Amino acid sequence: MRHYEIILLIHPDQSEQVPAMLERYKGLITAGGGKVHRVEDWGRRQLAYQINKLSKAHYLCVNIEAEQTVMGELEHAFKFNDAVLRHLTVQKKKAETGPSSMMKTVEREEARKAQQAEYAANNS
């Protein structure tokens, strides 16, 4: 089996359906004998350029281990799901289970904001 990293850009109006969509894709992967190593929900973010007249999208990052037949089914599901604006699949050499650089950036930003709030509360 091969390791893959999949990035999904989902229509911002469909953000509530992201967990159900993710479960459906996980079901496809596990039914084909694959494994899901990491799922990161990056949330709603600004796009670099407009896609279908939209300037924001809901981002998901999924690291999986699966056969090529399962990947074909997933690609087919992505293409025919109107909520998926774009998808990118990259083959990896090994399974990635730690936080991605995007999540590390988000965690650093949250820690910085918490530290500023604590500093402001102490100096008031």
From Swiss-Prot:
- Which PROSITE patterns does this chain map to? RIBOSOMAL_S6 (PS01048)
Function, as annotated: Binds together with bS18 to 16S ribosomal RNA.
Report the NCBIfam families cross-referenced here: S6 (TIGR00166)
Give the UniProt record's GO annotations in the biological process aspect.
Answer: translation
**Which UniProt keyword terms apply here?**
Ribonucleoprotein, Ribosomal protein, RNA-binding, rRNA-binding
| Comp. bias regions, Basic and acidic residues | 105-115
UniProt lists the family membership as follows: Belongs to the bacterial ribosomal protein bS6 family.
What is the name of the protein in this document?
A: Small ribosomal subunit protein bS6
Q: Which gene encodes it?
A: rpsF
Region annotation Disordered: where it falls in the sequence: 93-124
Q: Which organism is it from?
A: Variovorax paradoxus (strain S110)
One Pfam family recorded for the sequence: Ribosomal_S6
Entry-linked PANTHER family: MITOCHONDRIAL 28S RIBOSOMAL PROTEIN S6, SMALL RIBOSOMAL SUBUNIT PROTEIN BS6M
